[in-house]
Amino acid sequence: MNTENPIEKPFRKTGDPVDLTSESPLHPRRKSRRIMVGPVPVGGGAPISVQSMTNTLTANVPATLQQIAELTAAGCDIVRVAVPSQDDADALPEICRKSPIPVIADIHFQSKYVFQAIDAGCAAVRVNPGNIRKFDEVGPDICKAATDAGISLRIGVNAGSLDKELYAKYGGPTPEALVASALKEAHMFEDVGFHDFKISVKHHDVITMVETYRLLASKGDWPLHLGVTEAGPAWQGTIKSCLAFGALLAEGIGDTIRVSLSAPPAEEVKVGCKLLEYMGLRPRKFDIISCPSCGRAQVDVIQLASAVTEGLKDVTAPIRVAVMGCIVNGPGEAREADLGVASGNGKGQIFIKGKVIKTVPEDQIVDTLLTIANDIAAQMEADGQVPVNSTGPVVVPIQHPGH
């Protein structure tokens, strides 16, 4: 048996995201202006931030702050809270003061809450021009208040609340209708000298959403907030968001994202962070490779992979672990990972850096992997092996007209 201890050697990086600060050979990020949401930059080449929204009653300050803490722990950069009532507006000062990440107030219907949110210390306010009463009249005042407070705004256009005139003109919430709504308000903001805003044009349909953002991206340099509205339950919404975001981010479109799921908000953040990690747009953390299992598997791969994932869920080092169930792909995949196991005949071969270091009984595989993985992760962190924070996509996108 090989008695050499691979952990004592400088550890090989595997699959770190490519540093895409250069323009070639991949598609560059779309050029956009930079705005600030509190201390978080959005646009202008800044790292793509992950957002979510609380589902508590905002007026319930302890519950809202608890959920914000959970979102922060999951990797959330910016949080949005709903403000449908006066009680919610009254809760904003304390929430903003105690939140560890920037708070955006989400305002519909009542423009008075916009001004209260600005006064409360919100880092930004989302306004929906489709349902705020007399928005054309109050818009300039909102811009002035935001300018005086030094905060940014988001023009949030949704298919479900599109202005009635635009709906009738374009025959529904088409890409052209959504973009027309966004441009109308963007030009109004800019006409009064306000430029610190980003835009979202959300639709529940993936194809329509992608077409809408492509069209909007060709019209100006505003930072774009990506989202598939009303995406659905966890599995369905995850698929929709990954398809839509993947298509756009691969073309350099998108400056901040929110995965909308009918699920606990922290799940939105986990999906968003992993999506960006896999596209090379966010520092990579722990990742697991596991086979789908088949008739050749001689171990319960599903249970084994789940146990390893759960045991390493809090690891932040960019360690990649392979859990394989047979000898067909097992040794090869395990050798390509930082740490891996190829299982069979009631035992598992443990690989580190492509070398077999030991063979253990099946009932010791999980504990062995967790122990070694934590040792490797600790060394990675001690050696300063942190993943590159990329600024562009890692796949070659399809060019499209107007971009």
UniProtKB/Swiss-Prot annotation:
Its EC number is 1.17.7.3. The keyword 4Fe-4S applies. Signal peptide: none annotated. Residues 1-16 have a biased composition (Basic and acidic residues). GO terms for molecular function: 4 iron, 4 sulfur cluster binding; 4-hydroxy-3-methylbut-2-en-1-yl diphosphate synthase activity (ferredoxin); 4-hydroxy-3-methylbut-2-enyl-diphosphate synthase activity (flavodoxin); iron ion binding. The keyword Oxidoreductase applies. Its cofactor is [4Fe-4S] cluster. InterPro entries: Dihydropteroate_synth-like_sf, IspG_bac, IspG_bac-typ, NO2/SO3_Rdtase_4Fe4S_sf. Residues 1-31 are annotated as: Disordered. It holds the Pfam family GcpE. [4Fe-4S] cluster binds at residues 291, 294, 326, 333. Keywords: 4Fe-4S, Iron, Iron-sulfur, Isoprene biosynthesis, Metal-binding, Oxidoreductase. Coiled coil: none annotated. Pathway: Isoprenoid biosynthesis; isopentenyl diphosphate biosynthesis via DXP pathway; isopentenyl diphosphate from 1-deoxy-D-xylulose 5-phosphate: step 5/6. Binds 1 [4Fe-4S] cluster. It catalyses: (2E)-4-hydroxy-3-methylbut-2-enyl diphosphate + oxidized [flavodoxin] + H2O + 2 H(+) = 2-C-methyl-D-erythritol 2,4-cyclic diphosphate + reduced [flavodoxin]. Disulfide bonds: none annotated. It comes from the Bacteria. One of its GO terms (biological process) is isopentenyl diphosphate biosynthetic process, methylerythritol 4-phosphate pathway. Converts 2C-methyl-D-erythritol 2,4-cyclodiphosphate (ME-2,4cPP) into 1-hydroxy-2-methyl-2-(E)-butenyl 4-diphosphate. Belongs to the IspG family. PANTHER family: 4-HYDROXY-3-METHYLBUT-2-EN-1-YL DIPHOSPHATE SYNTHASE, 4-HYDROXY-3-METHYLBUT-2-EN-1-YL DIPHOSPHATE SYNTHASE (FERREDOXIN), CHLOROPLASTIC. This is 4-hydroxy-3-methylbut-2-en-1-yl diphosphate synthase (flavodoxin).
